[in-house]
Amino acid sequence: MSKTFAEIAEAFLEPEAVRIAKEAVEEYGDHERKIIQIGIHFQVCCMFCDEYLSTNGSDRFVLIEGRKRGTAVSLQNELCKSYDLEPLPFLCDIFDREEKQFVEIGITRKADDSYFQSKFGKLGNSCKIFVFSYDGRLDKNCEGPMEEQKLRIFSFLATAADFLRKENMFNEIFLPDNEETIIEMKKGKTFLELRDESVPLPFQTYEQMKDYCEKFKGNPRELASKVSQMQSNIKLPIKHYEQNKFRQIRLPKGPMAPYTHKFLMEEAWMFTKISDPERSRAGEILIDFFKKGNLSAIRPKDKPLQGKYPIHYKNLWNQIKAAIADRTMVINENDHSEFLGGIGRASKKIPEISLTQDVITTEGLKQSENKLPEPRSFPRWFNAEWMWAIKDSDLTGWVPMAEYPPADNELEDYAEHLNKTMEGVLQGTNCAREMGKCILTVGALMTECRLFPGKIKVVPIYARSKERKSMQEGLPVPSEMDCLFGICVKSKSHLNKDDGMYTIITFEFSIREPNLEKHQKYTVFEAGHTTVRMKKGESVIGREVPLYLYCRTTALSKIKNDWLSKARRCFITTMDTVETICLRESAKAEENLVEKTLNEKQMWIGKKNGELIAQPLREALRVQLVQQFYFCIYNDSQLEGFCNEQKKILMALEGDKKNKSSFGFNPEGLLEKIEECLINNPMCLFMAQRLNELVIEASKRGAKFFKTD
């Protein structure tokens, strides 16, 4: 154990807190710096529950934190049994005897409520959550704590932070939440033996294989002779693409592919309000919108503009308003909610027949034939929505991102500046708006699925953002906005397997009339009017427009939940691609060429009026982000198969650019495999059309492997 950490802990922490922290570090094998973090957390828990009595004179709080794990689990289970509570799947810090509820204490350095949101996403309302920050901020999901408790805790945290800063240990001890502790590993004898056993034949050891790979130099003649030898053993003849050129991909014909994403994008309309840190939970946000924005006045008309089951949707909307009004967010089971939620409508299995009974006929035991999906043609609406996603929205800061760690060298300074530049471009796009909506909404759905699988719950379709004006003026704390796009109803969700499905019914706001070809899956009502702010010169005027309610029943799986709730990963992939290009150019020139590369290096993004369109990397970022996000929301077996097969055509195109020969066994079969994946996925059809355009352009520029017609 490092004497430095131990001495610092003993200088300002109570001896009992230091002892508990040392035991915890040894028990869980944490880094020594955790001594101070654990000690501070334990002392805060003690301050929270010390010297407080219940109405009967006994201790009000039971301290669970600081005990051995086995003892803590036994104590928590005993408390649950004594007070007739459901057992919790996680350990809490404190138990409140007076309110018969567990308490979770958190401590953070962050200036926003992201740490609280992560805790709330895991724990929900199953216990009371209080998150204290070193700068005097308190995030919570309930009333409390007492004023005396807060003052004692904040005073202690301020003293601890000042002491650690004087010792120059604050940044070292409290690492950013996304930074992992470096683990030093040594290659032991067993590891080396296993490594040598895993090398492929004819190599005997890893070092032998490594030496061969480092000295290997390809011999084209030798490789050609080996190919000709193998060709005699293969029945399929090798076909060179110069003689067997690729034709264009045939797109399916038929009705236009409908919109299949779970939430509206371009047509979505949002109501906004200034965010209240004290009321940041999903249910509280929804209550505030209905109370302050008078959204309860939204009443769908009797006859829908299009769609099925209007009576069911209208009645369910009225039940949603009642659930929000009584603040329970729970819808009781009835004919409408059960019908739309798919409760009791699962296909029945063939009943088991006892061995003593005779089977009358085998026809009843046959499974019905699966109907293949109907092929759909390329949707004209997709291009317009793609371009809309690239453009800027009215607000910015849609996707919550982690803080940047301190830079240790000049190259990391370049990278930090580059990432902030790219994030500034991407955070204000319409695509980022939809990503933020997926992250928060699906995250809330995941919480409800885990905590209330047997209930029908109401969840807002919402996102958070920041005002552009405050961001541009450089204000210290930009105004955060809560944006409500609609309401989602989660049906019963017993997700036992990764592919387990559950039904959701969405009610989304819009000021646009439905497109019959695009919105085939929606039932759309007129639902009153709303006021739209429009700029006329330098003044802003309000115009009243019709408000539409788009209703739809769809389903989400456990895997899809995970994809959509982690949509911010699209940022990482996009920014990593451009960052690699910029840092490579800077490393070659041994100077900072980040801005020059962003502004001067061009990237092809599409065609317009028969001509290629290229944009600087700074703007092409938007296209990269939209593509990554669309992969996330439209991903299915069709898209996976298409991307897997199209790589071979792109490899042939790259070989043609480098004037290399390309060949394969069955080029026509490759195209047929690609066309098998083109059924009704809009993203697949869009990418196939883009690939055809790329082939046409390559042929005009002299490509040898593609037909011009």
Swiss-Prot record:
Gene Ontology BP, a term: cap snatching
Ligand binding (Mn(2+) 2): 65, 93
Main enzyme class: hydrolase
Cofactor, free-text remark: Binds 2 manganese ions per subunit.
UniProt keyword annotations, A-Z: Cap snatching, Endonuclease, Eukaryotic host gene expression shutoff by virus, Eukaryotic host transcription shutoff by virus, Host cytoplasm, Host gene expression shutoff by virus, Host nucleus, Host-virus interaction, Hydrolase, Inhibition of host RNA polymerase II by virus, Manganese, Metal-binding, Nuclease, Phosphoprotein
Cofactor(s) needed for function: Mn(2+)
GO terms for cellular component: host cell cytoplasm; host cell nucleus
Motif (Nuclear localization signal 1 (NLS1)): 109-124
UniProt xrefs under InterPro entries: INFV_PA, PA/PA-X, PA/PA-X_sf
Chain location of the short sequence motif Nuclear localization signal 2 (NLS2) per the record: 166-228
Protein's UniProt keywords contain Membrane: no
Record-listed Mn(2+) 1 binding positions: 41, 93, 104-105
Entry keyword annotation includes Iron: no
Post-translational modification remark: Phosphorylated on serines and threonines by host kinases, including human casein kinase II.
Pfam family, one: Flu_PA
UniProt GO molecular function: endonuclease activity; metal ion binding; RNA binding
Record-listed E.C. numbers: 3.1.-.-
Quaternary state and interactors: Influenza RNA polymerase is composed of three subunits: PB1, PB2 and PA. Interacts (via C-terminus) with PB1 (via N-terminus).
Task of the protein: Plays an essential role in viral RNA transcription and replication by forming the heterotrimeric polymerase complex together with PB1 and PB2 subunits. The complex transcribes viral mRNAs by using a unique mechanism called cap-snatching. It consists in the hijacking and cleavage of host capped pre-mRNAs. These short capped RNAs are then used as primers for viral mRNAs. The PB2 subunit is responsible for the binding of the 5' cap of cellular pre-mRNAs which are subsequently cleaved after 10-13 nucleotides by the PA subunit that carries the endonuclease activity.
Family to which the UniProt record says this protein belongs: Belongs to the influenza viruses PA family.
Record's protein name: Polymerase acidic protein
Lineage, opening ranks: Viruses, Riboviria, Orthornavirae, Negarnaviricota, Polyploviricotina
Gene name, Swiss-Prot/TrEMBL: PA
